[in-house]
Structures are given as C-alpha cells and as structure tokens.
Amino acid sequence: MWYNLLNSAQTAQEKRKGYSMKIVLVGGGKVGTALARQLSEEGHNVTVIDTNKARVEHIGESYDVMSILGNGSSITTLSEAGVEEADVFIAVTGSDELNLLCCMFAKKAGHCHAIARVRNPSYSHELDFIKKQIGISAIINPEMAAAKEISHLPVSYTHLRAHETGRNL
C-alpha cells in the first residue's frame, strides 16, 4: 500500500528518467526502519527523524539515509530535514496525533505529499474530514488495510481448493 502511494507521487516522466524522490520520514520504529531501508534501496533520498538516539544512530549506520535526532513536529527539525524540498513526507510514530501534527506542519512548510499512519479505530469515520482539513494525501490504518486485503482473498472452500490444485472455476 505504501509503495502504491509513493509511486503515485512520481510522474511518468520522472519514473522514466530515474528521478529519485526526496522523502522525509518521521518515526524510526519497525515500520519507519523498514520504509527507510526499502526506499533507500530503491534509490530515493531519505531522511529519518526520531527522538530516540539509539534508533537514529542504528538507522544512520545501517542504511544509506540521513538520520536526525529530533522532534518531527518541530519546524526547526523539519527544516533541518529539508521538508521544504521534500516530495513526500511520511509520519509513522507510535502516536496518531503526533503523526497528524507532523503532516500538518510538513504541508505548511513545504509542498509535499503527506502520509500519516493512524491506528486508532475511533478516527476511522473522520479520516476523510482530517485528510481534507489538513491536506494530507493519505491516512493509512494498518489494521483496516490488512482487513481490506484479506477480504479480497478467495474465502470459499471451492475457491481455495481450486487455487491449491491450479484449476480455474
């Protein structure tokens, strides 16, 4: 899902020319680290911001990314990360509210696509309103995304058996 959103941020012309995007990522936990690794391996210019010194050092030493120790909701830190020139901004901290705040500040400071991870199901009915009011390109709820993917899988025994044996129904 992240990959599709990032892909849509690039124009077809940029993809043909091998254009690498400038991506600022707030949150160096499991998801943030995995994203930093994947995006840097794809040749993008990635900057990771986190408040945990050990995480920042690990990410900076392990991957071809710039890592900054700081608060992703600080305009000073966002400026240091180059959010003004960023194509994409992604917030994946452990706090939904911090993710939304970071995206709001990033949108005000630059002209990037902003993506926030929001896990709390109580926000699920307000996501469109939040996206519109803050100007966020996408809000991703991992649990809802997983449920949507699973719902597209064949669930009947007949379909599962046909898939197992390679027969078409």
Regions found by a protein language model. Name each.
Residues 32:
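N-terminal Rossmann-fold NAD(P) dinucleotide-binding loop
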Residues 22-25:
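Beta1/beta-strand and adjacent pyrophosphate-binding region of the FAD-binding site
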Residues 39:
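Aromatic pocket-lining residues of Rossmann-like dinucleotide-binding sites
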Residues 1-20:
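Short, Lys/Arg-enriched N-terminal segments with co-localized hydrophobic residues
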Residues 159-169:
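Single conserved hydrophobic/aromatic residue that forms the stacking wall/gate
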Residues 28-29:
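Glycine-rich Rossmann-fold phosphate-binding loop(s) that bind the pyrophosphate
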Residues 57-153:
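Phosphate-bearing ligand-interacting subdomains
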Residues 50-51:
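Conserved acidic E/D residue at the C-terminus of a beta-strand in Rossmann-like folds
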